[in-house]
């Protein structure tokens, strides 16, 4: 069985929150009700919680043997001092060593045997897929600068209705 949880939309149907789901080949998912908590036996979990909240939630799932794909930065950053600088104390540092960076094009074999996939962010995926083959063939220097842009609603920013729908852009390009 498939279940979908949500904080702010618990009790609503997936198709009501995400109308595009009903218009795709995944129509059956539109009728799933969003729940506030995970229910029943779990084969795997994809966590889309914010940084820190994800590690707090998935630590017990991992301890119970449930495979997890985590989309936050919680298991991507292997150095605890760096993580602490950006997010504060890590809620589940004991799981960091077993996490595999989830870019299947480069880490396919490692991903087959891990219980926790540290899913890369969109900018990292774009950069690594573009320049990864050149790195692997030793065609470029090992240190590069990637200048990547996102829309103002990217990086988990929430739209503020009181500002006309914009998020919090610092400056323009």
Where in the sequence are the language-model features?
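N-terminal Rossmann-like NAD(P) cofactor-binding subdomain of oxidoreductases
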Residues: 1-172
């Amino acid at each position: 069985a498939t279940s979908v949880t949500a904080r702010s939309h618990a009790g609503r149907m997936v198709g009501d929150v995400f109308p595009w789901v009903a218009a795709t080949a995944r129509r059956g998912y539109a009728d799933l009700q969003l729940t506030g908590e995970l229910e029943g036996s779990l084969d795997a979990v994809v966590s889309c919680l914010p940084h820190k909240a994800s590690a707090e939630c998935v630590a017990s799932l991992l301890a119970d043997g449930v495979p997890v794909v985590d989309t936050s930065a919680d298991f991507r950053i292997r150095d605890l001092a760096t993580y602490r600088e950006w997010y504060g104390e890590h809620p589940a540092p004991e799981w960091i060593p077993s996490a595999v960076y989830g870019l299947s094009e480069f880490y396919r074999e490692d991903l087959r045997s891990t219980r926790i996939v540290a899913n890369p962010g969109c900018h990292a995926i774009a950069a690594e897929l573009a320049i990864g083959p050149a790195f692997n063939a030793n065609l470029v220097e090992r240190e590069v600068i990637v200048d990547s842009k996102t829309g103002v609603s990217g990086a988990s920013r929430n739209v503020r209705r009181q500002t006309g729908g914009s998020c919090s852009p610092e400056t323009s390009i």
